[in-house]
Regions:
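Divalent-metal-activated hydrolytic enzyme cores
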Residues: 157-164
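Acidic/glycine-enriched connector segments
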Residues: 2-126, 134, 144-156
């Protein structure tokens, strides 16, 4: 298992859940954010080790998080829209591997985590970008992504300890 870092854009919802899961497990995390560190709930707290992009907004941040990672896990609930759709489109444009995890199709976080793990292993992902709707676009997104990514990270760490 090769995962060594989680990145995201720091927005509320799925992005922040991925960072929360990494921080809770002491896995390195980071990513690019707009220069003003703004998210829909205000300034992104400093506990998230994110790099501000001076004079840049959400689109540039999303592009760099896609291009600077080995692959992207997109967790969503209904349809791809807004920044979540942009992430998928940038993955395709930049020929970066990605996996779409629909909570509507895979409501069990353990099953979703298994799919993400298979993607990480199959694509040789060391730096994983995690993206999805902000909190206002999916009320349950943070909780779902926190469970999924928490399980992904726990499994990776357990396997690295046991050498499998």
């Amino acid at each position: 298992m090769t995962l060594r870092k989680i990145v995201s854009g720091g927005q509320t919802g799925v992005d922040r859940a991925a960072l929360d899961a990494a921080l809770a497990a002491n896995l390195p995390c980071g990513g690019w954010v707009p220069g003003d560190r703004m998210a829909e709930d205000g300034i992104i707290p400093e506990r998230y080790p994110l790099i501000p992009l001076p004079n840049c907004g959400y689109r540039q941040r999303t592009r760099l998080n896609v291009s600077d990672s080995d692959g992207t896990a997109i967790l969503y609930n209904e349809t791809l829209k807004g920044g979540t759709r942009l992430t998928r489109n940038l993955c395709a444009l930049l020929n970066r591997p990605y996996i779409l995890i629909s909570a509507r199709e895979i409501p069990d976080p353990n099953v979703a985590a298994a799919a993400v793990l298979k993607f990480i292993e199959g694509s040789g992902i060391q730096v994983l970008n995690v993206s999805g709707p902000r909190a206002s676009g999916w009320a349950g997104g943070h909780a779902f992504a926190l469970q999924v990514m928490g399980q992904v990270i726990a499994t990776v760490q357990e396997r690295s300890v046991h050498g499998s």
